[in-house]
Amino acid sequence: MWPSDAHLALSLVVNVEEGAEMSLRDGDKGPEPVDELGVHLKIPIRNFANESNYLYGIRAGWPRVEAVLAKHGVPATFTAAALALERAPDIAKALSGGLHEPCSHGWRWVHQFSFDEARERDFVRKAVDSIRATTGQRPLGWLSRYLHSPRLRRTLAEEGFLYHMDDFSDDVPRWDVVETDAGPRAIVLVPYALDTNDMKFWLAPGYTPEQWLDYAIETFDVLHEEGAAAPRMMSLGVHLRIIGRPGRIRAFDRFIQHARSKRGVWFATRLQIARAFAAATPAPAEPAAT
C-alpha cells in the first residue's frame, strides 16, 4: 500500500493553534482553558499569562520545531487553525514550499460542534479560504478541536475534502461513505493518535521528555515490526508551545533520528497517506441514493 513497499507510514503532525485560541480579545466569553498549569478561570477576564504561554509557541517554539524538521529533511502535516497562520506569516510561508502540508484545524481553535449547519459550513469555508490565501495551498484534510457534529463529515465531503482525521479507531486508514445532497460520497479516515501526543506533558500525571520519547519509540517499533506483515501507519502529534520548549525539543529530534535509522519507513504527510491508501484500496460500493 505504501511506496517502495514500506512497512510503516510515519505521520508527523505539528499543531498550530497559537493566536487562534479562545480569548476575550477575539470576542469569546472567557479565556482559553487549556493551560500548562491546569488553571481554569471561572470569570471573564483576560488570562495574560496563558496568552503569553501560547505566544511562546510562535516566538520560540516554532523556530526549534522548524530547525528539527529541516535538520532531518522530513515532511510534516501542519494542522493549523487558519487565524493562527494569518497572525504568524512566517509559518504560513514555510508551508508554501511544498514539503509540508497544511491541514485545516478550523478557522479558529474553538469548539464548533455546537454550531448550527449554516454556521458550521461557514466555519469550514472560511478556514479553507484563509489557509489557501496564506499558504497558497488548499487544505484537503480536517481536524476538529476535540468534538465534532454528526453532520461534519458530510459537510467536509461536500466541500471537497479528501480526508478527515477526527478518528482514533485503527492503525491504518479506512473509507467512510456519507450521504450528501448530491448522493453518497466516500471520504478517507486517516486516524490520529492521542497516546503519542505531546499533550501528555500537560496532562496529569505529566510525562517527562524521557517517558514521552520511550513511549513514542516503543509505539514506532511495534508498528514497524507489524508492518512487515501488513502495512501500518503511526501518528506523532506535537504543539509549538509544548514540544518547542528547550527541555522537550531534543525528545522530538531523537524520535526522528530513531525512525530514520530503520528501513522501510515512509515519512509522509497525511495527504500523501490518504492518496496512497485511496490508490491502493478501492472505495467501497456506494449505496444507491434515496
Task: State the predicted function of each range.
Residues 1-188, 213-236, 242-290:
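Catalytic alpha-helical scaffold of carbohydrate-active enzymes acting on polysaccharides/glycoconjugates
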